[in-house]
Amino acid sequence: MLTNRLALTLFTLTTIAMAAPPALLASGNDDDTRCSNRTLRGDFAFHIEGAFVDAPMPLLIRGVAMTRFDGRGRLSQVDHVVFNGMLPPVDWTPATGTYHINADCTGEAEIIIPGSPFSPVTLRLVVGADGRRIETVVSKPGYDVTSTAVKVDSSR
């Protein structure tokens, strides 16, 4: 009988924990773990690397970008991306786009590069370090590309 009661108690506690919103299960202050579009505001310097694999032979990709997030779901950027050692047709390629950040600090972005055969670029991302760091992966068939960004200190 004690075993049944213990099993029922464990089952009840497990059910409650599974049904509880993730914010209730997090340790620490809720404000420390909650994200939204407002979490990304300002300029971020990106380092990009990977490969375009939807070709007879993979094309290596290396680049940098400066992206400005407006805190409301819109972004603008310039990038310099080298494909297999070939310089881009425009030194600093401009782009615009949108992004959405979920409460758990995951999100997505879409970048539109006018005139580019690679546009749009669809990203999945994770925001960390209180909105000061971003990790991304291109979420589009044929790409194996990741990037890391840090917020640019505008106080200088």
Label every model-predicted segment:
Residues 21-156:
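Mature soluble binding/inhibitory domains
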Residues 9-19:
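Bacterial N-terminal signal peptides
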Residues 1-11:
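Bacterial N-terminal signal peptides that target proteins for export
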